[in-house]
Amino acid sequence: MYRYKITIEYLGTDLAGWQRQAGVMSVQQILEEAIYKFSGEQVILFGSGRTDAGVHAIGQVAHFDLSKYLEPHKIITAINYFARPYAVGVWNCELAPNNFHARFSATSRYYIYRIINRPYPSVIDLNRAWWISSPLDVPAMQQAAVYLLGKHDFTSFRASSCQSKSSIKTLTELNIIKEDEEIKLYLSAPSFLHHMVRNIVGSLVLVGKNIWQVEQIKDVLEAKDRKAAGPTAPASGLYFVKTAY
C-alpha cells in the first residue's frame, strides 16, 4: 500500500464541515468520492482536524492509502478536477511513511480568526469573517489573552457536545493583531476542544467591547463552566491554517 499525505484548502460556507455525515455534503465526502473517480479505490480519508460547518481551511492535512502508485502531481490534478464545483482543492501531495497519521502524528495545530471591525459590513468578506460594527479595544483583548496562554482546564470554553476525554489543553499561542479595519487572532496548540477557539474569541470580544473587564477572562477560566464564558463566535471567521508534525 502507498500512503499519500495531502494538504487541502476549502471554503466551508456551503459545507457541513470536515466529517462525512448522512444527507449533507462534507469535505471528507467530496475528496473521498473524487479519489474514487480517478483511482477506482474506496478510500477512507483521515484529517488532521475536524472543522465545523462554515469553518474554512488554508492548510488542512489528510492521508489516505492506495494499492497502486500514482505520481503525486497527478493526484493533485485529478482530485481538483473531480472535486468541482465545490470550493475544495488540494495544493500539495506527497508520499508518506506507512506509520504517518494525519491526526495522531500531529504535534501542533494553527488557527486564525478574522474580525472585520468597521461601521459597515464588507461584501468581499461576507461569510469569511465576523463583522463587528462597534470599535473593539484591542489592547484590552491582548491583555486578557495572556490569562489563557499555557496549560489550563478549558472547560469554560468547550462545547457541551465536546467528546474529548480531557479538558486540559496547552495554548501555545494567542496573538491579536489589528491591521487597518481587520483584527486577526492567531492561536496554536497541540490540540483543541470542540468550539474552543470560537468560544475564546467570543469571550475576548466581550472584553474588546468593554462589557467585561480584562481580569474577567481569568475568572471565566477558573469557573470551569461553559455558562460563564461568552458566546460562540461565528464559524465564518475561523480558518484552519496548518498542522505541524
UniProtKB/Swiss-Prot annotation:
Transmembrane segments: none annotated. One of its GO terms (biological process) is tRNA pseudouridine synthesis. GO terms for molecular function: RNA binding; tRNA pseudouridine(38-40) synthase activity. The keyword tRNA-binding does not apply. It catalyses: uridine(38/39/40) in tRNA = pseudouridine(38/39/40) in tRNA. Belongs to the tRNA pseudouridine synthase TruA family. PANTHER family: PSEUDOURIDYLATE SYNTHASE, TRNA PSEUDOURIDINE SYNTHASE-LIKE 1. Homodimer. This is tRNA pseudouridine synthase A. It comes from Rickettsia africae (strain ESF-5).
